[in-house]
Amino acid sequence: MDNLAAIILAAGKGTRMKSGIVKVMHPLAGAPMVAWPVAVARQAGAGRIVAVVGHQAERLREHFSNDADITLAVQEEQLGTGHAVACAAGDLSGFSGKVLILCGDVPLIRTETLRAMVTAHEATGAVLTVLTARQENPHGYGRIIRGFDGRVIRIVEEKDATPDERSRTEVNAGIYCAEASFLFDAVKRIGNDNAQGEYYLTDIITMANDRGLRCTAHPVADPVEVMGINDRVQLAEAARHARRRIAEEHMLNGVTLVDPAATYIDQGVVIGADTTIQPGVQIAGGCRVGEGCTIEAGAIIKGSELGDRCVVESRAVIRGCRLGSDVVIKAGTVMEDSTVMDHAAIGPMAHLRPGSELGAHVKIGNFVETKKIVMGEGSKASHLTYLGDATIGRNVNVGCGTITCNYDGVNKHRTVIGDDVFVGSDVQFVAPVTIGSNTLIAAGTTVTRDVPADSLAIARTPQINKEGWKLRKRDQ
């Protein structure tokens, strides 16, 4: 919307976090805390967003570097919320619409709440609308003081409040909708004659009333939406609420979560209908999970894409991978930055290291490790094997104990194996070496030279049987 802008207050250090990371950059369900109100402002229709930053401004600048609709205004000294808004005024010079003011450490506000507040603001003709909440324990919040007609006449901060004012339970949520023309004129006139010596944004309410302008309150239905985060205890509580919200959205879209409270799904994850997720699962980093999948207990999936009808068994770890449809990842398998095509089966207890590209119907069995390999359709390595820096064709059988010897102490070398090759057990390929198609590599062979197609390669010490040797040895 061209007539709606947003200011995100994100300049504070967050001393109570006891951290070297500025408060608003602490992660909450997969995204920095400050990213939540930014996303909600966008969804509410804000066409221009100004984030007021201070401590570790460069960290925030880097995070928002690809967001064309976000401008950063620097508040060199944190002199209060009124001063912060004044710092943003220059970036909205000439703007004449409505301005949402949000807090970077109040991440759980809903889009629907902001839209409703903007609608109410327009309907009442107010110059300022304050989002308020009823709190059983209002300690630390500014109290809402209403006039006889229900309008907001002022907000009193906790440290400046009288005992009677502190007894009130309607509090300021720190979120506002204001007319730009009024807002930017008013913040220039704010003083700092208060217990904190700060420039309170709430002082503009008194200014509006003194001019006969309307200030209204818009109550939020759920106080959780406006909970602020000041320490790691509150961060954990907010994360619990965020995960519940995320879980409910997925369940309403046809996903089965066996135990939602024990399932950890980050913001932005996409999961198809009829997928079932068991307890203890973590899905993070912008994952996409297809329809009809089963994710068993304790699995971890990060930054990956899974096709339809995949099965990820217990305690599997998948990071940065792309899986086709009908893939089975068995228990205890670890996969990193790899691609697995349709109908493949991996594990149990396999390790796919970065650069593994496995074709359709491939089988990688227990205690097999791969790295930087391309493996063709229908090939299999069923157990106890290392395949690194290799290109393996279609329908290849790799026997137990096979190793590609890819490192000579200085450089890595590749092994190339053609289609329809049978590799017996306990074979070593000393790279660089090329194996032609339709060959058989006998068990126990150490391959040091290329093998032509349609051949048998065998390289082992001849067997010698010394009859009676054991008896003679015993009698000595």
Curated annotation (Swiss-Prot):
CC per GO annotation: cytoplasm; membrane
HAMAP family per record: GlmU (MF_01631)
Name this protein carries in UniProt: Bifunctional protein GlmU
Record GO terms (molecular function): glucosamine-1-phosphate N-acetyltransferase activity; magnesium ion binding; UDP-N-acetylglucosamine diphosphorylase activity
Lineage per the UniProt record: Bacteria, Pseudomonadati, Thermodesulfobacteriota, Desulfuromonadia, Geobacterales
Biological or metabolic pathway of the protein: Nucleotide-sugar biosynthesis; UDP-N-acetyl-alpha-D-glucosamine biosynthesis; N-acetyl-alpha-D-glucosamine 1-phosphate from alpha-D-glucosamine 6-phosphate (route II): step 2/2; Nucleotide-sugar biosynthesis; UDP-N-acetyl-alpha-D-glucosamine biosynthesis; UDP-N-acetyl-alpha-D-glucosamine from N-acetyl-alpha-D-glucosamine 1-phosphate: step 1/1; Bacterial outer membrane biogenesis; LPS lipid A biosynthesis
Organism: Geobacter sulfurreducens (strain ATCC 51573 / DSM 12127 / PCA)
Keyword match Cytoplasm: yes
Role according to the record: Catalyzes the last two sequential reactions in the de novo biosynthetic pathway for UDP-N-acetylglucosamine (UDP-GlcNAc). The C-terminal domain catalyzes the transfer of acetyl group from acetyl coenzyme A to glucosamine-1-phosphate (GlcN-1-P) to produce N-acetylglucosamine-1-phosphate (GlcNAc-1-P), which is converted into UDP-GlcNAc by the transfer of uridine 5-monophosphate (from uridine 5-triphosphate), a reaction catalyzed by the N-terminal domain.
Free-text cofactor note: Binds 1 Mg(2+) ion per subunit.
